[in-house]
């Protein structure tokens, strides 16, 4: 059996497959040349991350393909239903990156409440001439402890976010269409464990009660957070999106940031990737990262 890992694979993944007698090819094949390469080299398994797509046309044109694997959680770049209808197995690694994504959420949160996203831009420019002014500008930070975080989508990643939030002394509110209650277990360095039950609430209650909102939902056809939802949020609240682009109305978000309705936003995913809106990129109230939620050495090793 031949496996084409078109978007890369970790050495541990190569070793595991090779030890099982499987040939692993790590050549990066351009999307437009992928069909020919798969057919000419008798590829049975196509492994992708987020760069390579596996759409209907490719599936139809590659009758020898048996498995499509996605290293990561979201499978937006694969026509999953169609592939399965055609008899292919479609697999992913849903738990491998949960901790990494959750930690990135808090990287944005910690940076947001202390204005690091803006001070990191201005200190290199004006730190030597306007130090006291900048110190004054960023002197009204706040703590996360005692604040309420609302988690929209309470699957694996949402629950990892809850663990960190509870460790920070935050109140956790969650909303999920498919989960009523969830047990969150905190594991400590000395082997102790503490388990807490979190009951989910309707999304409107979460929106109205949260100081910070973070989204952990799959791709949606409509905004989860649009102008109407933002209007219901607390004044000065903040929002983080490390889920999928298109779950937040970015136009409404920027308007809310500019008006002062929201204090800051942290975005790892965008409506238009890989060319996010300039207004989003240039906002001095947005903490930015280029869709790197799963991009840690540990997560990539678990993904394979």
Q: Whereabouts are the PLM-identified features?
A:
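An N-terminal-biased, well-structured beta-alpha scaffold segment characteristic
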Residues: 1-91, 208, 226-228
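N-terminal Rossmann-fold NAD(P) dinucleotide-binding loop
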Residues: 158-159
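Phosphate-coordination loops involved in phosphoryl transfer and adenosine-cofactor binding
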Residues: 65, 145-148, 227, 236
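Rossmann-like adenosine-cofactor binding region
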Residues: 39, 54-58, 177-279
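Short, Asp-centered acidic motifs that coordinate Mg2+ and/or phosphate
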Residues: 44-45, 67, 212, 238, ...
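Glycine-rich Rossmann-fold phosphate-binding loop(s) that bind the pyrophosphate
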Residues: 154-155
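Phosphate-binding beta-alpha-beta segment of Rossmann-like dinucleotide-binding domains, i.e.
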Residues: 86, 94-148
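Adenosine-phosphate binding glycine-rich loop
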Residues: 275-277, 282-304
């Amino acid at each position: 059996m031949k496996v084409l890992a078109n978007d890369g694979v970790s050495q541990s993944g190569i070793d595991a497959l090779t030890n099982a007698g499987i040939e692993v090819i790590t050549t990066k094949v351009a999307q437009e040349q992928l069909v020919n390469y798969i057919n000419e080299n008798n590829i049975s398994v196509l492994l992708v991350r987020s760069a390579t797509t596996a759409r209907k046309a490719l599936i139809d044109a590659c009758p020898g393909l048996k498995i499509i694997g996605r290293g990561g959680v979201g499978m937006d770049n694969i026509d999953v239903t169609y592939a399965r209808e055609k008899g292919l197995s479609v697999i992913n690694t849903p738990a491998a990156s949960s901790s990494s994504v959750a930690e990135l959420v808090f990287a944005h949160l910690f940076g947001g409440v202390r204005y690091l996203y803006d001070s990191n831009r201005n200190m290199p420019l004006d730190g030597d001439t306007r130090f006291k002014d900048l110190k004054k500008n960023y002197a009204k930070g706040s703590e996360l402890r005692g604040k309420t975080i609302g988690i929209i989508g309470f699957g694996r990643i949402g629950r990892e976010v809850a663990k960190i939030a509870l460790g920070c002394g935050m109140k956790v509110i969650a909303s999920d269409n498919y989960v009523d209650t969830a047990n969150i277990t905190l594991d400590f360095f000395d082997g102790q464990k503490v388990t807490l039950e979190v009951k989910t609430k309707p999304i409107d209650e979460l929106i109205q009660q949260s100081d910070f909102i973070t989204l952990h939902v799959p791709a949606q056809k409509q905004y989860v957070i649009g102008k109407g939802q933002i209007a219901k949020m607390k004044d000065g609240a903040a929002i983080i999106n490390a889920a999928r682009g298109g779950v937040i109305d970015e136009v409404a978000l920027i308007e809310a940031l500019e008006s002062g309705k929201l204090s800051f936003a942290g975005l790892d995913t965008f409506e238009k990737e890989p060319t996010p809106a300039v207004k989003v990129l240039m906002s001095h109230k947005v903490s930015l990262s280029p869709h790197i939620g799963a991009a840690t050495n540990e997560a990539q090793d678990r993904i394979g």
